[in-house]
Swiss-Prot record:
Entry-linked Pfam families: Maf
Major localisation: cytoplasm
A biological process from GO: nucleotide metabolic process
Protein name: 7-methyl-GTP pyrophosphatase
Enzyme class: hydrolase
Source organism (scientific name): Xanthomonas oryzae pv. oryzae (strain MAFF 311018)
Annotated coiled-coil segments of the chain: none
Amino acid sequence: MPRLILASTSAYRRQLLSRLQLEFDTGRPEVDEQPQSGEAPSALASRLAAEKAAAVAVRLPGAWVIGSDQVADLDGQALGKPGTRAQAQAQLTAMSGRTVRFHTAVSLIGPERELHALDLTEVQLRALTPAEIERYLDAEPALDCAGSFKCEGLGISLFDAIRSQDPTALVGLPLIALARLLREAGFHLP
């Protein structure tokens, strides 16, 4: 079996990939995550997933490298990871009662081959009061998550609905698409 590398230091992505029961290592991708001028959120996610995989693949010839990225999209504007509580409050306030699109891209780069996929998840947030936003951030300050919430935790209470073909995509790694790409690359999965 060829060597498999996850180009990420994200604990969320490591946990998800471990569900496929394949042995893998991780590598830290060094890429500039700034959007290019006029770049759509879906294109940004796709480009960053490919760049992350390529940045690690160049150091490990012969390995298959998985890169993934997620971009939250509110009315065509990319929302980054908040980083601060104030920014998380602003994001959650802006998303309150609205639909947010999450573009989650995955790239698999190996010897002389690249495979790519993109998943779209739509999250309908319920109307949130300022007090609810404060209580949520007190309980689960999701400052390292696109959209300022963790759907796998208490963040699910902020939603009215989720629409997606792959429920793992919202956590940051679309396993249905990735399993397909891995099978195409010759990995043995059920």
